[in-house]
Swiss-Prot record:
The keyword rRNA-binding does not apply. Can form homodimers and heterodimers with IGF2BP1 and IGF2BP3. Component of the coding region determinant (CRD)-mediated complex, composed of DHX9, HNRNPU, IGF2BP1, SYNCRIP and YBX1. Identified in a mRNP complex, at least composed of DHX9, DDX3X, ELAVL1, HNRNPU, IGF2BP1, ILF3, PABPC1, PCBP2, PTBP2, STAU1, STAU2, SYNCRIP and YBX1. Associates with mRNP complex. Interacts with FMR1. Component of a multisubunit autoregulatory RNP complex (ARC), at least composed of IGF2BP1, PABPC1 and CSDE1. Interacts with AGO1 and AGO2. Gene3D superfamilies: 3.30.310.210, 3.30.70.330, K Homology domain, type 1. GO terms for cellular component: CRD-mediated mRNA stability complex; cytoplasmic stress granule; cytosol; dendritic spine; filopodium; growth cone; lamellipodium; neuronal cell body. The modification Phosphothreonine is found at T528. This is Insulin-like growth factor 2 mRNA-binding protein 1. GO terms for molecular function: mRNA 3'-UTR binding; mRNA 5'-UTR binding; mRNA binding; N6-methyladenosine-containing RNA reader activity; translation regulator activity. Residues 156-190 are annotated as: Disordered. RNA-binding factor that recruits target transcripts to cytoplasmic protein-RNA complexes (mRNPs). This transcript 'caging' into mRNPs allows mRNA transport and transient storage. It also modulates the rate and location at which target transcripts encounter the translational apparatus and shields them from endonuclease attacks or microRNA-mediated degradation. Preferentially binds to N6-methyladenosine (m6A)-containing mRNAs and increases their stability. Regulates localized beta-actin/ACTB mRNA translation, a crucial process for cell polarity, cell migration and neurite outgrowth. The modification Phosphoserine is found at S12, S73, S181. It comes from Mus musculus.
Length: 577
C-alpha cells in the first residue's frame, strides 16, 4: 500500500512542481512522479511515508490554487471489501464507531493504524463488495463530533492472489482450515508462546534519560534483561506521557521495569522535577476486572503484600485510541517492583484464560474475529491457532457445516433495559445488525422484577457477538461497579433426554464443566420439560466463562445427537437384513 494517487491537479502541474511540494513538506518518495491530465501517481518508500503523505497533503495543501487530494492508489480489480477511514475523533469510543460501521454491513475486521496524526485511522474489511461501496458512499464526509471522515479503498490482496500463494498456512479466506490441511486433518497444532508485554507509561521528560546518549542506556537495559524494548515516542505528539513496551519473560520484564524506574527516580532527583515518580502500568480493560477481583479483594491483597498504594484509571477514560487502563503504583522502588510482578501475574493469568476460551471459540466458530468483535486486545500478537483436539469436542465440520440457530436467554439488571434498547430502539437495532441475530427483551415477570430476560436467537458466532456486546454495554454504562466484574445468568435449553449427559454420573460432567470454564453450571432438578420436551441449564459467570460453558454443553448435545443418528442408522440397516 505504498503507491499514492494524487488528484485534483491543474492541467499545467508538472513532475517538478510535485517534487518541490513534497520536498517542502519533507515527505519521502521513490522513483518518478507519473503525471496524467488532472492527476498523478507516485511510490513511497513504505506504508509509514504513504500515510504521512496522505495526512500532510490531502485536503490541506494547495498547488496552483487547488487543494491536493491524496489517497492510496488501488487498481479497480483490488477495489473490493477493504477501506481506510481517516480523521476519526481520537476520543471516540469503539462502541460508537462499531455501531456506525455496522449500519452498512457485516464488519469482518477493523484494525487501528498507527499514525503520527492526532486523529485516528482504521482499516475496515466488510463481507462483500456492495457493503463496502455503500460504506464509502455514506461515510465519506460524514460528520462525527465535528470531524469529517475521509474514506477510501485500500488494496484487497485476496482478490488477485491465488489459493496457493495468497493465504497463509492452509487456511481459507476467513480462517477455516482447508480440507486436507494439517490442522483440518488433526495434526498437532503448535501453540505460539504467550507474549503479553509489560506496558509502562512514563513522563515524557524522562524518555531521553531512559534511551540515553545515542541509545546507550536502553541498549544496556535490553542486554542485561534479555528483552526487546519499544519506546513509543512518536505516538500522541505533545503528550505529557509516553508508553514503553517491554517484551521478555516475566522475570526479564520485571528486571527492565526496575531499571527504568531507577533511571526515572535518579533523573527526577537530579533535575528536581518531581518529589515522587510513581510506577504506571498499562493493562487492557478486558483484564482489569479480574485484576481487581470481587469487591476489590485481589487488588487490596497486592497492596497489603507489597506495601504500596494502587489506583486504576476510570472506565470513562477509555477511547478509540486508548483501550487500556492506567494502574498507578506508589511506594518505594523495591515495593513498586514487587507490585508489578503481582499485577502482571494476574494480567497474564487472565490473558491465558481468555486465549484458552478464544482457542475454543475459533475451533467451534471458524472465522470468528475477536478483535473485530471488540472483546479481545487487537494488539495481542499471540493469537493461537485452533486446537487440534479439544477434550470432549467433536470436530466442527462433523456436525455444524451449516451453523444451527441457537436460542439463549441472558438476564440483565432491569434498570439496564433502556441502555440496551437505546434511544428510539437504535442501539438494539444496531446490535442486532452487527451480530446478525434476533434480539428481543421479554416483558417483566412481575412489576417489581429486578432482572429482565434478553432472548437472543442466532448461530454460534452471532451469539458470541451479541452476548459480548451486552456484557460490554453493562460495564460501560456503570451498571456494575468499577471494581466489579460483569457476571450474568444465562439459560440455554437442552433436550430432557440429554440432561443426564450434561450432569454426568454422580455430577462428574457438570463438575468438570465448572472447573474447566470457571462458570457456575446448574441443571435444576425436578424440572417439567416444556412443550418441546426441553429443560433449562443455568450458566452464571463472566463473558468468557459463560461462552466456554455454552460451547461445551453444545458439544455434548451434538455428540448425543450423533450417537442417536448412528443408532437409528444401524437399526435401519439391521431391519433391512
Amino acid at each position: 500500500m505504498n503507491k499514492l494517487y494524487i488528484g485534483n491537479l491543474n492541467e499545467s502541474v508538472t513532475p517538478a512542481d510535485l517534487e518541490k511540494v513534497f520536498a517542502e513538506h519533507k515527505i519521502s518518495y521513490s522513483g518518478q512522479f507519473l503525471v496524467k491530465s488532472g492527476y498523478a501517481f507516485v511510490d513511497c518508500p513504505d506504508e509509514h511515508w504513504a500515510m504521512k503523505a496522505i495526512e500532510t497533503f490531502s485536503g490541506k495543501v494547495e498547488l496552483q490554487g487547488k487543494r491536493l487530494e491524496i489517497e492510496h492508489s488501488v487498481p479497480k480489480k483490488q477495489r473490493s471489501r477493504k477501506i481506510q477511514i481517516r480523521n476519526i475523533p481520537p476520543q471516540l469510543r469503539w462502541e460508537v464507531l462499531d455501531s456506525l460501521l455496522a449500519q452498512y454491513g457485516t464488519v469482518e475486521n477493523c484494525e487501528q493504524v498507527n499514525t503520527e496524526s492526532e486523529t485516528a485511522v482504521v482499516n475496515v474489511t466488510y463481507s462483500n463488495r456492495e457493503q463496502t461501496r455503500q460504506a464509502i458512499m455514506k461515510l465519506n464526509g460524514h460528520q462525527l463530533e465535528n470531524h469529517a471522515l475521509k474514506v477510501s479503498y485500500i488494496p484487497d490482496e485476496q482478490i488477485t492472489q491465488g489459493p496457493e500463494n495468497g493465504r497463509r498456512g492452509g487456511f481459507g479466506s476467513r480462517g477455516q482450515p482447508r480440507q486436507g490441511s494439517p490442522v483440518a486433518a488433526g495434526a498437532p497444532a503448535k501453540q505460539q508462546p504467550v507474549d503479553i508485554p509489560l506496558r509502562l507509561l512514563v513522563p515524557t521528560q524522562y524518555v531521553g534519560a531512559i534511551i540515553g546518549k545515542e541509545g546507550a542506556t536502553i541498549r544496556n537495559i535490553t542486554k542485561q534483561t534479555q528483552s526487546k524494548i519499544d519506546v513509543h515516542r512518536k505516538e500522541n505528539a505533545g503528550a505529557a506521557e509516553k508508553a514503553i513496551s517491554v517484551h521478555s519473560t516475566p522475570e526479564g520484564c520485571s528486571s527492565a521495569c526496575k531499571m527504568i524506574l531507577e533511571i526515572m527516580h535518579k533523573e527526577a532527583k537530579d533535575t528536581k522535577t518531581a518529589d515522587e515518580v510513581p510506577l504506571k502500568i498499562l493493562a487492557h480493560n478486558n483484564f482489569v476486572g479480574r485484576l481487581i477481583g470481587k469487591e476489590g479483594r485481589n487488588l487490596k491483597k497486592v497492596e497489603q503484600d507489597t506495601e504500596t498504594k494502587i489506583t486504576i484509571s476510570s472506565l470513562q477514560d477509555l477511547t478509540l485510541y486508548n483501550p487500556e487502563r492506567t494502574i498507578t503504583v506508589k511506594g518505594a522502588i523495591e515495593n513498586c517492583c514487587r507490585a508489578e510482578q503481582e499485577i502482571m501475574k494476574k494480567v497474564r493469568e487472565a490473558y491465558e484464560n481468555d486465549v484458552a476460551a478464544m482457542s475454543l471459540q475459533s475451533h467451534l466458530i471458524p472465522g470468528l474475529n475477536l478483535a473485530a468483535v471488540g472483546l479481545f486486545p487487537a494488539s495481542s500478537s499471540a493469537v493461537p491457532p485452533p486446537p487440534s483436539s479439544v477434550t470432549g469436542a467433536a470436530p466442527y465440520s462433523s456436525f455444524m457445516q451449516a451453523p444451527e440457530q441457537e436460542m439463549v436467554q441472558v438476564f440483565i439488571p432491569a434498570q439496564a433495559v433502556g441502555a440496551i434498547i437505546g434511544k428510539k430502539g437504535q442501539h438494539i437495532k444496531q446490535l442486532s445488525r452487527f451480530a446478525s441475530a434476533s434480539i428481543k427483551i421479554a416483558p417483566p415477570e412481575t412489576p417489581d422484577s429486578k432482572v429482565r430476560m434478553v432472548v437472543i436467537t442466532g448461530p454460534p458466532e452471532a451469539q458470541f457477538k451479541a452476548q459480548g456486546r451486552i456484557y460490554g454495554k453493562l460495564k460501560e454504562e456503570n451498571f456494575f461497579g468499577p471494581k466489579e466484574e460483569v457476571k450474568l445468568e444465562t439459560h440455554i435449553r437442552v433436550p430432557a433426554s440429554a440432561a443426564g449427559r450434561v450432569i454426568g454420573k454422580g455430577g462428574k460432567t457438570v463438575n468438570e464443566l465448572q472447573n474447566l470454564t470457571a462458570a457456575e453450571v446448574v441443571v435444576p432438578r425436578d424440572q417439567t420439560p416444556d412443550e418441546n420436551d426441553q429443560v433449562i441449564v443455568k450458566i452464571i459467570g463472566h463473558f468468557y466463562a459463560s461462552q466456554m460453558a455454552q460451547r461445551k454443553i453444545r458439544d455434548i448435545l451434538a455428540q448425543v445427537k450423533q450417537q442417536h443418528q448412528k443408532g437409528q442408522s444401524n437399526l435401519a440397516q439391521a431391519r433391512r437384513k
